[in-house]
Amino acid sequence: MNLNIDKVSVTIKNEEILSDINANFTPGKIYGLLGRNGAGKTTLISLIASYRKVDQGSITLDGKTIYENDEMMQHVNFIYNTKEASTETDQVKEYVESHAMFRNDFDQDYAYELLKKFKIDDSKSFNDLSQGQQAAVNATLGLASLSKVTIFDEVTNGMDAPTRELFYEEVLETEDRENRIIILSTHIISEMEHLFDEIIMIHEGKVLLQETTNELLEKGFTVAGKAEKVRDFTLNKNVIKVKFLGALQIDTVIGYLGPEELEFAEDQHLDISRLALQELFISLTNDENGRD
């Protein structure tokens, strides 16, 4: 089932939160949904999950509108860290069973297997768990739902490093992966970079880009060396930041480098470094680029 977002706009209290959003998701891929605070990520997720209706445009799964469509809504699962009043005193086991009742594809055996891996005692009440353990339970519910579209919104908040690493492993190896669309909305970009097949970057309510991770990582680099040589090399390129360290100049550039340019840079004793995804994200969404 493909998920398609077509020309979606949303206005809240006379403020346009999303403007003409277009994005496409295909099964078997893990998508990184990236954006600064207030960019519109949460609003977009709430639309996919049918928490609210679009003002303009459409969101469809397998060609069918999701909003108020029970058949399609069954295939979308939105996971985020929250305490629902009805679950605070429930045992974890009861929490899992209640989710299984409302999710046709939910795999309870898989859920309990995951809880064991996360070292969660399912006889404890959800409220007695630490924040990180609660996050692990919520992550378990998302993975075990086997929903065609599973959205994790900052689900690793509160998890310690080993638990986050285990979650990442399970995302990559999750059951029925080839038929699922997994969307990860996160600010921990450096840790999750290796998970993403494609990146969708939201900035100021618009889709800044949708590209494969490999394509995107070819898009930014730094050039370091003697100031005059750096300036000559980056002339007519999209330089978004210039930094000086003594006699050394470092330019951050958005664009692609061909083999001949790389060879020329080496001849000029210039140091070329690819930007990590987090650095690239910061650079692309920074409205105050310039000199340091």
Regions found by a protein language model. Give the residues of each.
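ABC-family P-loop ATPase nucleotide-binding domains
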Residues: 71, 78-138
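Conserved ABC transporter NBD signature motif
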Residues: 57-68
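Walker A (P-loop) phosphate-binding loop of ABC-type ATPase nucleotide-binding domains
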Residues: 35-40
